[in-house]
């Protein structure tokens, strides 16, 4: 329940001040245009609480201590004018409640989301020196993007979208759009832009109504049907976690250097091998990578049954495909990889991940309580590996042209280096991320992030290298085994 004062505040117009960053010193002038908006919906709805996806992303932002801002740079034609981008910003604000939502925090209650019907948002125009060369202009833009990536939004007072125009010698050259990740994920950002591109050319209005807003989703999840879905998901988690074998407790072992690290492997043979396997098994590349990950993790841990959390986009659910908001949550992936082929693991993984997706939709606070209860009963902390396949979150990962076994083997002969990055903090023991940029279709990048006091650097590298070597071996020989033996229980 939200206080009446907050509801009234949501109905009134609100002005947000422009953001001031250190990189502004690289520019010779700064101008601000206040863009007004007027959209449907206001206040906090019947409950004002956060929906499950919002709970998840806010928790991730807090745990990481990172803004997780999303930045996009658009190069502009010489004919671009400021008024066009004021209208674009107004379109997003008028149409999408997520872009005009602020949060209210209280020590006594969970966060509340408040939608504003009217208000203004600043559109900034930054001027480069007229005599700035291309190198200076590029450096200034790079610095601006880097600062906006790290400059957190004020969730209580700043609407979750910033637009900054770069001007050089009187000509607009670039648009930087910054989104607060709490407001939407990448798929939602693309949906916003698609709606803008497909608007009516005469009226400038969208061609249809918004299917659903985040506040609508909050109301849906509070219904009896929503509660049943959450309860079913939590029962699945409880059953699967209770069945996992207990592990021998291990103490943290400090390593020299930074405790939190990321190993990055950009692998051509991994993509080629996975593509060849995908053609053989008639599946997506993402399914192959999941099976390779499961096998590599089992080899590393020595456990025949692996359990991992997966980031699941719930956009496959009815009415949620194009929502501008966050609908991703953790799913639980469990499967056995012992005494079988890599091909078989990949096919099993496709069946297992269906359950993962089905039960990745639940009330986060109840989920936290369940995990705490399970850990008490088991007498150990459940530090599961996290797996995130970013390309599969953007859409399908159908394989490209089928490479020959010779092509895969030739690529494997060239060893790519592991690139190490020190992290200031990381909130998981171990996380594997498939991170293939849309403009890189020649390789797949595996990011292994970890607390190196629990997962040594050699194990981080081994995990990425094993995924690659398994892909090459299985691409060339369908009979390739996982190399994981079944554990035989002692009699008596």
At which residue positions do the language-model features occur?
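Short amphipathic alpha-helices and their capping loops
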Residues: 2-63, 87-131, 159, 212-260
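A short, small/polar-residue-rich loop/turn motif at beta-strand boundaries
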Residues: 11-16, 28-45, 78-94, 112-157, ...
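His-Asp-centered acyl/peptidyl-transfer active-site segments
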Residues: 12, 62-70, 97-98, 157, ...
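Structural preference for long, well-ordered alpha-helical segments in enzyme cores
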Residues: 20, 53-57, 81-99, 137-148, ...
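Gly/Ser/Thr-rich phosphate-binding loops and adjoining beta-strand/alpha-helix segments
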Residues: 30, 37-47, 64-84, 155-176, ...
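Acyl-group handoff/entry surfaces in thioester-processing enzymes
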Residues: 37-38, 42-115, 134-222, 354-366
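Acyl/amide activation-and-transfer machinery of modular secondary-metabolite enzymes
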Residues: 54-77, 106-132, 157-162, 172-173, ...
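Extended, hydrophobic beta-loop-alpha segments that form or line the acyl/peptidyl-thioester binding
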Residues: 96, 100, 190-194, 304-311, ...
């Amino acid at each position: 329940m939200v206080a009446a004062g907050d509801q009234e505040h949501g109905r009134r117009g609100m002005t947000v001040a422009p953001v001031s960053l250190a990189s502004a010193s690289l520019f010779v002038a700064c101008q601000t245009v206040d863009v007004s908006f007027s959209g449907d919906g206001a206040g906090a709805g019947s409950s004002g609480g956060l929906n499950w996806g919002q709970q998840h992303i806010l928790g991730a932002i807090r745990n990481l201590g990172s803004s997780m801002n999303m930045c996009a740079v658009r190069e502009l034609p010489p004919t671009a004018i400021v008024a066009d981008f004021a209208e674009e910003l107004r379109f997003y604000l008028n149409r999408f409640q997520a872009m005009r939502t602020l949060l209210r925090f209280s020590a006594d209650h969970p966060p509340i989301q408040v939608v504003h019907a009217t208000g203004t948002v600043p559109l900034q125009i930054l001027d480069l020196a007229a005599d700035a060369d291309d190198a200076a202009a590029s450096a200034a833009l790079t610095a601006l993007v880097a600062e906006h990536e790290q400059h957190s939004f004020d969730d209580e007072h700043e609407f979750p979208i910033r637009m900054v125009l770069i001007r050089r010698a009187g000509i607009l050259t670039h648009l930087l759009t910054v989104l607060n990740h709490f407001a939407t994920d990448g798929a939602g950002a693309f949906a916003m832009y698609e709606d803008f591109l497909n608007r009516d050319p005469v009226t400038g209005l969208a061609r249809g109504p918004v299917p659903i807003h985040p506040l609508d989703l909050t109301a849906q999840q509070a219904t009896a049907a929503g509660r049943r879905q959450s309860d079913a998901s939590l029962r699945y988690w409880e059953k699967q976690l209770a069945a996992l074998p207990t592990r021998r407790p291990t103490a943290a072992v400090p390593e020299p250097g930074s405790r939190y690290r990321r190993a990055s492997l950009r692998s051509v043979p991994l993509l080629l091998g996975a593509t060849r396997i995908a053609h053989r098994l008639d599946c997506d590349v993402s399914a192959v990578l999941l099976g390779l990950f499961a096998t590599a993790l089992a080899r590393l841990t020595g456990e025949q049954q692996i359990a991992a959390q997966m980031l699941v986009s719930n956009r496959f659910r009815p009415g949620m495909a194009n929502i501008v908001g966050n609908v991703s949550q953790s799913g639980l992936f469990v499967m056995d990889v012992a005494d079988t082929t890599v091909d078989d693991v990949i096919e099993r993984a496709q069946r297992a991940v269906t359950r993962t997706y089905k039960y990745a939709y639940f009330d986060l606070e109840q989920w936290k309580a369940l995990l705490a209860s399970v850990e008490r009963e088991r007498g150990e902390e459940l530090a599961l590996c996290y797996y995130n396949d970013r390309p599969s979150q953007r859409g399908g990962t159908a394989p490209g042209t089928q490479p020959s076994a010779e092509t895969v083997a030739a690529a494997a002969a060239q060893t790519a280096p592991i690139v190490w990055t020190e992290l200031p903090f990381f909130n998981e023991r171990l996380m594997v991320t498939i991170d293939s940029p849309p403009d890189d279709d020649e390789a797949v990048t595996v990011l292994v992030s970890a607390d190196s006091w629990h997962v040594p650097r050699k194990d981080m590298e081994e995990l990425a290298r094993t995924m690659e070597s398994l892909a090459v071996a299985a691409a060339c020989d369908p009979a390739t085994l996982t190399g994981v033996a079944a554990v035989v229980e002692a009699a008596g």
